[in-house]
Swiss-Prot record:
InterPro entries: Ribosomal_uL18_bac-type, Ribosomal_uL18_bac/euk
Role played: This is one of the proteins that bind and probably mediate the attachment of the 5S RNA into the large ribosomal subunit, where it forms part of the central protuberance.
Domain of life of the native organism: Bacteria
Name of the protein: Large ribosomal subunit protein uL18
Entry-linked PANTHER family: 39S RIBOSOMAL PROTEIN L18, MITOCHONDRIAL, LARGE RIBOSOMAL SUBUNIT PROTEIN UL18M
Source lineage: Bacteria, Pseudomonadati, Pseudomonadota, Gammaproteobacteria, Thiotrichales
HAMAP family documented for this protein: Ribosomal_uL18_B (MF_01337_B)
Keyword set, alphabetical order: Ribonucleoprotein, Ribosomal protein, RNA-binding, rRNA-binding
Organism of origin: Francisella philomiragia subsp. philomiragia (strain ATCC 25017 / CCUG 19701 / FSC 153 / O#319-036)
Family the UniProt entry places it in: Belongs to the universal ribosomal protein uL18 family.
Key word Iron present: no
Subunit details: Part of the 50S ribosomal subunit; part of the 5S rRNA/L5/L18/L25 subcomplex. Contacts the 5S and 23S rRNAs.
Length: 117
């Protein structure tokens, strides 16, 4: 089993558990160039809020979109958008990635700006 397949199987396990519990989840996806975050409803049918480094307002705040600083900015933006929609508590779905680097920066920034995991 290669790295990508192992990550995908870890993410499937997490998503199944979160779907059973019915919690709203903050889902993270990363590429070498960008970081994406979505808040998805408990049943998995609706995206309630989203933010990424592809967006112009986020891209303007950072020099390079694939690093820890830009991930922290995405975490801040997603937390603010959740506040506007009245969402304060989410389950953190790291999509099988290690809790390190960009994923950790996004999570900590979201926590600092009012999201509870």
């Amino acid at each position: 089993m290669d790295k990508k397949t192992a990550r995908l199987s870890r993410s499937k396990r997490t998503r199944i558990k979160l779907k059973e519990l019915g919690h709203t989840r903050l889902c993270v996806y990363r590429t070498p160039r960008h970081v994406y975050a979505q808040v998805i409803s408990g049943d998995g049918s609706t995206v309630l809020a989203a933010a990424s480094t592809v967006e112009k307002d986020v891209k303007a705040k950072c020099k390079y979109t694939g690093n820890v600083n830009s991930a922290a900015i995405v975490g801040e933006v997603i937390a603010n958008r959740c506040k506007e929609k009245g969402i304060s508590q989410v389950a953190f779905d790291r999509s099988g990635y290690k809790y390190h680097g960009r994923v950790k920066a996004l999570a900590e920034a979201a926590r600092e700006h009012g999201l509870q995991f």
